[in-house]
């Protein structure tokens, strides 16, 4: 929106051409979303408290979590609002990738909103029935996958890229739709499973979003892409604005979500942010790198899958409780220790993911 204004004002003063730089608009995206989050946060928390929109806590979980009952939830609406406003202000609105990622983020956020709302109304932690949650996730995930497949302009946009392996590209054809579906829906649910402790999900999301933002910037520049042997995806660089907005909104939300949390993001935030990360990774053809950088999300998801499979097959549990962050809590780790150690793991994994740029 403001980019269009800057382009118009260039005819009066050449200084407005500075807004053509992606790096500047990415930074402005961070700052705008951060300020919006910090500004709207207190108002949102007060509103949620007045309307008694509080978190319902599982009674079979760690006893320390019982004190969290009633903490305002659905704070993800703050994150999505800041991301949306900042992106619309600073991104090129003629870019199809910007609209795809925004649409996926808001649609998955809508699923989470309904889920959170039902939890609040029914005063339990079940929310929207799983079959309906997965149904709508599948509808929106497949919709995004089909759109990206149908609008692909070059073969590389539907090709599987394997990091660390030079010049190895696997054309996916219609398989691109299937892979994209699983990446988007899987990422959405993985972040949601991770969102069980104060600040546990949002900081890794910010870190992974920052890492993917770097890939977006590089993939959108033909010179960088050729030098680093990564796919050149015209227009993908514009997603650095969205990633910047995600970083700013996430950090602003963390101000209120850090231990002990004043507000939880709820499914409205977790489902949306996970889907956004998955969609961005698909666009820049870095699904494998997302798997690496989002290792904490993968670990949380696998712990649930292993726990369920083990109990159904043998009647025994592998972990004291799943997702795995609860396992460590029940082992006696204080909540802040679990959170910070998972953050440290994410820092390392994001650096490993970025290292694949040179290890080819």
Curated annotation (Swiss-Prot):
GO biological process, alphabetically ordered: cell division; cell wall organization; peptidoglycan biosynthetic process; regulation of cell shape
Superkingdom of source: Bacteria
CDD domains referenced in this protein's UniProt entry, alphabetically: GT_MraY
Keyword Cell inner membrane on entry: yes
UniProt-recorded name of the protein: Phospho-N-acetylmuramoyl-pentapeptide-transferase
Cofactor(s) needed by this chain: Mg(2+)
Pathway the protein contributes to: Cell wall biogenesis; peptidoglycan biosynthesis
Main location: membrane
Family: Belongs to the glycosyltransferase 4 family. MraY subfamily.
Gene: mraY
Enzyme class per UniProt: transferase
Catalytic activity entry: UDP-N-acetyl-alpha-D-muramoyl-L-alanyl-gamma-D-glutamyl-meso-2,6-diaminopimeloyl-D-alanyl-D-alanine + di-trans,octa-cis-undecaprenyl phosphate = di-trans,octa-cis-undecaprenyl diphospho-N-acetyl-alpha-D-muramoyl-L-alanyl-D-glutamyl-meso-2,6-diaminopimeloyl-D-alanyl-D-alanine + UMP
GO molecular function: metal ion binding; phospho-N-acetylmuramoyl-pentapeptide-transferase activity; UDP-N-acetylmuramoyl-L-alanyl-D-glutamyl-meso-2,6-diaminopimelyl-D-alanyl-D-alanine:undecaprenyl-phosphate transferase activity
A Pfam family recorded for this sequence: Glycos_transf_4
Entry membrane topology: Multi-pass membrane protein
Transmembrane spans: 25-45, 74-94, 97-117, 132-152, 168-188, 199-219, 236-256, 263-283, 288-308, 338-358
Keywords assigned by UniProt, alphabetized: Cell cycle, Cell division, Cell inner membrane, Cell membrane, Cell shape, Cell wall biogenesis/degradation, Magnesium, Membrane, Metal-binding, Peptidoglycan synthesis, Transferase, Transmembrane, Transmembrane helix
EC number(s) recorded for this UniProt protein: 2.7.8.13
A GO cellular component entry from the record: plasma membrane
Taxon lineage: Bacteria, Pseudomonadati, Pseudomonadota, Gammaproteobacteria, Pseudomonadales
